[in-house]
C-alpha cells in the first residue's frame, strides 16, 4: 500500500485498504454532491472510478461545486474531476463518460 494512505490504513486495516484499492465505483453526476463524492473516494484509496456526466462547468457552479473554478469554466466536469483525481493519485484508473445515464443510454455503459 502506498504511503499516502498509511493514515487511513491505521484506521481501517490492511485488508480493508486492499479492498478499497481493488474496488471500482461509478459516480453519476459530478456536480454539487458527485464532485465531493469523487474527491472523497480518490482520497480514500479506491482504485478505479467511472465518472458519468455530460455537463460542463459554468459560472453558477463556482459557489457550490468542487470542480468549479474560474479556470475550469467551460470544461467538462468529468475531465476536470479526472485531472483532480490524478493530482491526488496518478495510479487511480479513471474512465469518463461524457453522456447522461438514462434508460435510452444505459446500453452504452459497461460496468463489468
Protein language model features and the residues they cover:
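Hydrophobic/small residue at the entry helix of a nucleotide-binding pocket
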Residues: 33-34
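Aromatic pocket-lining residues of Rossmann-like dinucleotide-binding sites
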Residues: 41
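Conserved N-terminal Rossmann-fold NAD(P)-binding element of oxidoreductases
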Residues: 27-29, 52
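N-terminal charged helix/coil linker that caps or initiates catalytic domains
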Residues: 1-26
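A structured beta-alpha segment of the ubiquitous adenosine-cofactor-binding alpha/beta core
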Residues: 74-112
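Glycine-rich phosphate-binding loop and adjoining beta1-alpha1-beta2 segment
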Residues: 46, 51-89
Amino acid at each position: 500500500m502506498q504511503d499516502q494512505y498509511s493514515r487511513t490504513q491505521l484506521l481501517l486495516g490492511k485488508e480493508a485498504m486492499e479492498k478499497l484499492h481493488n474496488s471500482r465505483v461509478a459516480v453519476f453526476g459530478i456536480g454539487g454532491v458527485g464532485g465531493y463524492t469523487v474527491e472523497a473516494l480518490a482520497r480514500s484509496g479506491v482504485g478505479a472510478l467511472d465518472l458519468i456526466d455530460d455537463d460542463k462547468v459554468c459560472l453558477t457552479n463556482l459557489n457550490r461545486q468542487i470542480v468549479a473554478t474560474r479556470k475550469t469554466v467551460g470544461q467538462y466536469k468529468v475531465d476536470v474531476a479526472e485531472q483532480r483525481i490524478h493530482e491526488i493519485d496518478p495510479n487511480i484508473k479513471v474512465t469518463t463518460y461524457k453522456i447522461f445515464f438514462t434508460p435510452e443510454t444505459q446500453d452504452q455503459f459497461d460496468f463489468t
